């Protein structure tokens, strides 16, 4: 006897999605365009997610600044090298932890590393501070809106991603 009730039956749509999601050992795929490298190591391909983690005060923000600076000039900054297609040059940077003052310092550090002037808005960098917005749902909605309403986005940085949820240990979030 089957213990499943009506809720166990997959809908035809789910069945179709499930089948399309399967990967076979004989499938052939090509490497997505490599857009970020550290020396010769690939750290970012177009369309994929990467995470930078480390202990507090471990210079994560500085490394992200160098990476963003490389993406901003589509070239090399320190050991980071970026090569984004022209149709994916916009960078969205969201900070959930720092004040506008400190966010501006981060932006200035990025521009300095990129060799760009500090008296003009950078063409491809959109920097947003979200600390003043308390609700994680609203922060996520703003990020989602920016991603879907900014043309040619190639890189999204979220500094403080844990602030996009109420409880980092919650299995439902």
What is each PLM-predicted segment?
Residues 85-172:
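Conserved inter-motif catalytic segment of the P-loop NTP-binding fold
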